[in-house]
């Protein structure tokens, strides 16, 4: 039966050969919990165990709920064809273009990998060091795995809520230029909610623009605009993993579910090439270390010892008014004019930015 798997899914057979599939819930002809990934997992398990009739029933049930799911249609066609003759390739339609079949194979692999390898409950993305109290949820995207994860702010600790298949840029991640068909990597926020009625059908059930380019992007000379989380056209259930012009694309059902977690102007959207995971203990240790550094900076500011305060800044520091020398001169003048300094930091958030640079994004309200 592994020969059939190779024919159905090509390289996916190697993934299945690594160990048995675990499919949650009782086996039934209904789609488990309305979850397309769970349903596909059940189909693949049936194929692995030579239960082709059961696999076909599950695909048929899946297509009742998701009639525009092209990958499911292709698997159904192969399962029907397998009744009459051996399969020699994934997608045995004479009319299907090779590039379209490759896209569907890539989607199948991405969905099954994500379904089989959910993050352990005692691990969290390294980036979510501290959400401010008003931020109820955070979004983390892994472009290599074609996956979006939702985490809840549980008294400061991120707790896994849900994850969804996504499409990203045709040419990958690390956007640098307008029109480069790449998805940006960094720390962003949802900036608006664009309802379906104001958009063309291409964007599906709606769109949520994000804050690309951010301050760091602009300092690095990156440009471009119009990076959104959005849905799919009405005649399409999902798109291949690498098919957008840079946006993060979800199925319409998944975007509708995601929308209930988004707070305009507040929800962080952290996009990575591949997520770094930390155990809860290691995450807590890294969080303490960074919060201690922030507290040292705050105390040194209050101390009016300008040299100690400036020691926290790189000589390459820049803001909208200039570089380090201008900043240092201004701080010395301001501090000399004060008899005391009181610094209170509210609504503190701390996010590690993915990517090659060791960059931490800290925001707060100063009182």
PLM features per residue range, with description:
Residues 80-126, 339-343:
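Alpha-helical linker/edge segments of TPR/alpha-solenoid repeat scaffolds
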Residues 192-295:
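Exported/periplasmic cell-wall-interacting domains
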């Amino acid at each position: 039966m592994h020969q059939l798997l190779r024919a159905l899914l090509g390289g996916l057979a190697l993934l299945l050969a690594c160990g048995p599939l675990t499919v949650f819930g009782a086996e039934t002809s209904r789609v488990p919990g309305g979850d397309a990934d769970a349903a596909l997992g059940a189909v693949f398990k049936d194929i692995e165990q030579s239960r082709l009739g059961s696999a076909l029933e599950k695909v048929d049930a899946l297509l009742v709920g998701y009639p525009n799911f092209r990958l499911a249609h292709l698997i159904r066609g192969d399962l029907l064809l397998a009744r009459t003759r051996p399969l020699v390739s994934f997608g045995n339609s004479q009319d299907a273009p090779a590039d379209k079949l490759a896209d569907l194979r890539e989607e199948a692999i991405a969905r099954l990998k994500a379904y089989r390898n959910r993050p352990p409950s005692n691990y969290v993305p390294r980036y979510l060091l501290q959400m401010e109290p008003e931020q109820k949820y955070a979004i983390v995207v892994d472009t290599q795995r074609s996956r979006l994860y939702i985490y809840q702010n549980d008294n400061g600790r991120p707790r896994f809520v849900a994850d969804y298949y996504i499409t990203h840029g045709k040419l990958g991640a690390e956007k640098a230029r307008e029109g480069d068909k790449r998805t940006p990597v960094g720390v962003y926020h949802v900036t608006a909610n664009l309802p379906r009625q104001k958009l063309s059908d291409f964007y599906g059930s709606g769109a949520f623009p994000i804050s690309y380019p951010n301050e760091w992007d602009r300092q690095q000379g990156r440009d471009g605009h119009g990076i959104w989380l959005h849905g799919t056209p009405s005649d399409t259930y999902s798109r291949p993993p690498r098919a957008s012009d840079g946006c993060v694309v979800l199925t319409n059902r998944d975007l509708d579910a995601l929308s209930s977690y988004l707070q305009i102007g507040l929800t962080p959207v952290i996009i990575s090439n591949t997520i770094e995971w930390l155990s809860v203990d290691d995450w807590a240790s890294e969080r303490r270390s960074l919060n201690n550094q922030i507290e040292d900076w705050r105390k040194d500011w209050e101390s009016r010892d300008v040299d100690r305060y400036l020691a926290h800044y790189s000589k390459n520091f820049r803001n909208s008014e200039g570089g380090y020398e201008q900043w240092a001169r201004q701080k010395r003048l301001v501090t000399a004019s004060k008899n005391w300094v009181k610094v209170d930091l509210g609504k503190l958030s701390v996010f590690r930015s993915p990517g090659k640079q060791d960059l931490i994004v800290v925001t707060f309200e100063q009182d």
